[in-house]
């Protein structure tokens, strides 16, 4: 029995901006369903492997195509958001994306379309996690996730 004291080094290893599907994945898989603003949750190496695998499955099964989709835009005359149809590059089949990495609406969370930005967030996730997993000292680290909005 004694006074044991520790100082830990914390380092950011991945960053996302408005990648709400990734946030929703962490909520479902690491945060017991919901994470509050700035709330930390533990992330294991196996969690990182699963997230990477889920992203790769969606990327492999999907193709971007041009399609008319409803989007919300601000109408300065009406001084409100209105729904309009716009041509966007979106996934031709969203079924696997909706199952493994569904988007999540939120005031600061960005678009919920399964579009080019969605695909880019999955590609960035795969790249970031690949780099993390390649670190020879990975088993010495502990990981946590939190989001700020």
Segments and roles (model prediction):
Residues 1-149:
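Acidic (Asp/Glu-rich) sequence patches and key acidic residues
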């Amino acid at each position: 029995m004694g006074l044991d004291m520790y100082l830990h080094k914390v380092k950011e290893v991945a960053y996302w901006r408005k990648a709400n599907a990734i946030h929703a994945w962490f909520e479902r898989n690491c945060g017991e369903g919901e994470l509050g603003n700035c709330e930390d949750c533990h992330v294991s190496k196996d969690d990182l492997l699963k997230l990477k695998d889920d992203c790769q499955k969606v990327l492999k099964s999907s193709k971007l195509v041009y399609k008319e989709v409803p989007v919300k835009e601000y109408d300065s005359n009406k001084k409100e958001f209105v729904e309009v149809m716009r041509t966007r590059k979106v996934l031709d089949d969203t079924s696997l994306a909706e199952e493994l990495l569904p988007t999540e609406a939120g005031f600061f969370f960005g678009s919920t379309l399964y579009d080019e930005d969605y695909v880019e967030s999955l590609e960035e996730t795969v790249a970031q996690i690949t780099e993390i997993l390649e670190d020879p000292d990975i088993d010495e680290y502990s990981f946590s996730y939190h989001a700020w909005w």
